[in-house]
Amino acid sequence: MSNRKYFGTDGIRGKVGESPITPDFVLKLGWAAGKVLARHGSRKIIIGKDTRISGYMLESALEAGLAAAGLSALFTGPMPTPAVAYLTRTFRAEAGIVISASHNPFYDNGIKFFSIDGTKLPDDVEEAIEAEMEKPLTCVESAELGKANRIVDAAGRYIEFCKGTFPSELSLNELKIVVDCANGATYHIAPSVLRELGATVITIGCEPDGMNINEECGATDVRLLQERVLAEGAHVGLAFDGDGDRLMMVDHLGNKVDGDQILYIIAREGLRQGQLKGGAVGTLMSNMGLQLALKDLGIPFVRAKVGDRYVLEAMQEKGWRIGAENSGHVILLDKTTTGDGIVAGLQVLTAMVRNHMSLHDLCSGMKLLPQILVNVRFSGEHNPLKSDEVEEVTRQVEKELGGRGRVLLRKSGTEPLIRVMVEGDAEESLIAEMANRIADAVKAAG
């Protein structure tokens, strides 16, 4: 990927009120995007958002910029990211824009774009938008200004789409499900989908106030979900992140089930049904246990760079249909075009119902190796990964693992963090000690 000024691995993101997430920047971004996208013909753009309080301000700024460029906006209101991708396709809009910072705290926000086919914008289009940003803002003639309208049935359209990915001959009548919507964009979608398919649904994280998104709930913190599943005697729990493109699950015993395990279940079920096309794509962070379990099933597996866009690129390159990150981004190209937490969850529930198996039993064919991830915040002025001390400690740990594990150090694409991952076939306490040793060296270098 080329060196761009504003766009990162997942759009543009930052703290609200600080560059680049300011009203004036976002207005200019809307205008620049409008100028570039108008060249392709369509004059309408879908705009969705999660439940952050800043979403109101930013969608107004975006709409003003688009209107000045002559494009009209169609607002969905709070809506999961994959719903915006879906609506962009069905409305034949030139693009979709999501205002969200995904799993980040409420005081962050971001902007990401989808193309007309519901996939993320190609690099060259993002680069063209950045180039347009450098030009002075102009306004089309009054008669050519864009308009703004609301898609009044956006939620209902997406609910029906999600239900359509669940087999019509099955139902969820026998399941009690706890769903945690992270006080985010799925709060009015996921419970309805599950109830309409017959499940008994208990909700948590479904009361957004603009500031409680992802706060001690959702896919990034499943402790509350684990407690509630056990307290309610539920069969399963589902947790989404703030914008609904990630999924974590909890089995009836309170165990967390991550993106690697979800990918394993979906791949194995696809194989059983004769519907698996090729293999499965994971990432550099995928647990080695996933690779070994898929190998036992004869399912090919490759690792992409971390980031759902890279998973998708690898899937397209291979012609494969399923891929996931262990963080819970699950992409199922036979169902949709981007990571979709609700759709992924429905495929796991399908496997449970069809095979009369618990989530715990579905996971039993895959043994997760101990994997410790430590996030180290740094100033951003120096790259700790280039430190001689960090390299030396990393070499020592790799030698101790003796070929029975992996060490991975990488910079986050969205935050000033170094992610330290150590994985191996050893006691978890030993793996944690190794990871903390490297993390301490990174802290000292940062």
Curated annotation (Swiss-Prot):
The modification Phosphoserine is found at S102. The lineage of its organism: Bacteria, Pseudomonadati, Pseudomonadota, Gammaproteobacteria, Enterobacterales. The keyword Iron does not apply. Belongs to the phosphohexose mutase family. Pfam families: PGM_PMM_I, PGM_PMM_II, PGM_PMM_III, PGM_PMM_IV. GO terms for molecular function: magnesium ion binding; phosphoglucosamine mutase activity; phosphomannomutase activity. Mg(2+) binds at S102, D241, D243, D245. GO terms for biological process: carbohydrate metabolic process; peptidoglycan biosynthetic process; UDP-N-acetylglucosamine biosynthetic process. GO terms for cellular component: cytosol. The keyword Amino-acid biosynthesis does not apply. Binds 1 Mg(2+) ion per subunit. Its EC number is 5.4.2.10. PROSITE patterns: PGM_PMM (PS00710). Catalyzes the conversion of glucosamine-6-phosphate to glucosamine-1-phosphate. It comes from the Bacteria. NCBIfam families: glmM, PRK10887.1. PANTHER family: PHOSPHOGLUCOMUTASE (ALPHA-D-GLUCOSE-1,6-BISPHOSPHATE-DEPENDENT) (PTHR42946:SF1), PHOSPHOHEXOSE MUTASE (PTHR42946). This is Phosphoglucosamine mutase. Keywords: Isomerase, Magnesium, Metal-binding, Phosphoprotein. Its cofactor is Mg(2+). The active site is at S102 (phosphoserine intermediate).
